[in-house]
């Protein structure tokens, strides 16, 4: 199996797995940004009736919401514990998602070109080789299909907000959630996309206002940002 995974990262998220669906837990930020992510993906690609792959699906927060929007969703992750939580939650939600224990690279070798939409959200900054994951996304999506990424920029402001602010001051996330050296500049992600044969269609920022405790999408890509890419039609 081509893992492209950091064992320490897997251990970290596996230990928290039972809290994925607790909206007051460490995963509260994911629950709060999920409507923004879902609306952005649906607005750009139209989820209803589409075959969608959610890479790094974790406990299934985004996967389930895309299924509820009418997509045929497959979710993959390398944390068995997170997948166990995701599968269990389907009994509660009544949604249908097909979950698999696999890396993006391994799944791409078996399912190339099978998906209309591939999502890879809040995941690239946790793998040793993000370019390999982007290349796998490009393999998995059909010609003319669409890929959606979200990750964190690498600069002083990002360190200040995403590490010091989120983990130490506001305590939105557990300490050690992010490793600054793994953050990815938009120019780097754009290069990974080009190398994989993907065209970048949109770059958008996501910001958090600590006073109102509200997340919003906009032009500020200094910290969190999203990228919409398209596979060329062959």
Swiss-Prot record:
Disulfide bonds: none annotated. Transmembrane segments: none annotated. GO terms for biological process: methylation. S-adenosyl-L-methionine binds at residues 37, 56, 77, 121. It comes from the Bacteria. Pathway: Cofactor biosynthesis; ubiquinone biosynthesis. It catalyses: a 3-demethylubiquinol + S-adenosyl-L-methionine = a ubiquinol + S-adenosyl-L-homocysteine + H(+); a 3-(all-trans-polyprenyl)benzene-1,2-diol + S-adenosyl-L-methionine = a 2-methoxy-6-(all-trans-polyprenyl)phenol + S-adenosyl-L-homocysteine + H(+). It is an enzyme of class 2 (transferase). Keywords: Methyltransferase, S-adenosyl-L-methionine, Transferase, Ubiquinone biosynthesis. GO terms for molecular function: 2-polyprenyl-6-hydroxyphenol methylase activity; 3-demethylubiquinol 3-O-methyltransferase activity; polyprenyldihydroxybenzoate methyltransferase activity. Its EC number is 2.1.1.222, 2.1.1.64. O-methyltransferase that catalyzes the 2 O-methylation steps in the ubiquinone biosynthetic pathway. Belongs to the methyltransferase superfamily. UbiG/COQ3 family. This is Ubiquinone biosynthesis O-methyltransferase. It comes from Aromatoleum aromaticum (strain DSM 19018 / LMG 30748 / EbN1) (Azoarcus sp. (strain EbN1)). The gene is ubiG.
